[in-house]
Amino acid sequence: MAKVSDLALLLVAGMAISLYIQETGAVKFDIKNQCGYTVWAAGLPGGGQQLTQGQTWTVNLAAGTQSARFWGRTGCSFDASGKGTCQTGDCGGQLSCTVSGAVPATLAEYTQSDQDYYDVSLVDGFNIPLSINPTNAQCTAPACKADVNAVCPAELKVDGGCKSACAAFQTDQYCCTGTYANSCPATNYSMIFKNQCPQAYSYPKDDTATFACPSGTDYSIVFCP
């Protein structure tokens, strides 16, 4: 029969393992605004926060959170209750987002599996420059630092942003759906985004733009890196 002291040690060890799993499963994101203008940061999960130049918003993802996305909104106006509108990235007229943002918006995407997977995505278009910076120095820090709006074709341009061809035209060729679901090459439109931001997803099948890092890594997301 196990002694009381042995049982106590087993209990302490079990608690330590449980705490370790919880700690390594939780992830912290520091969202920083380095733009020369106000950005209303958004996250699913997380909600939203107004960030003036130099401000940081911290989002702690609970252990077991499988995916998240973050983006910046511009040209926003909210009342005291948190209701309003944004020129780009609007999420149903709410300061604290519970739904995805309207296109176009530059996205930081995160998925947790056997390790962390993350990417900067222009699949929904572009509104502001963005980077993802892991705390693990061995991991890649992808960024889209260029002002894609400056080279946006007229047919993709909207106030404050540049739509992707998929968002603008909604065709199988540009969205990699239907007959293009299994074989979907880059297009002249996606190459505009890729040439400006080589590390970012430029269209739905641009899988070379996914990066991986060991689980337990924290991240900072920087607007206007």
Curated annotation (Swiss-Prot):
Cystine bridges: 35-224, 76-86, 91-97, 139-213, 144-197, 152-162, 166-175, 176-184
Glycosites: 188
Lineage: superkingdom: Eukaryota
GO term, biological process aspect, one: defense response
Keywords associated with the record: Allergen, Disulfide bond, Glycoprotein, Pathogenesis-related protein, Plant defense, Signal, Stress response
Signal peptide region: 1-26
Family: Belongs to the thaumatin family.
Annotated function: May be involved in disease resistance.
PANTHER family reported for this sequence: OS03G0233200 PROTEIN
Record protein name field: Pathogenesis-related thaumatin-like protein 3.8
Provenance organism: Cryptomeria japonica (Japanese cedar)
Taxonomic lineage of the native organism: Eukaryota, Viridiplantae, Streptophyta, Embryophyta, Tracheophyta
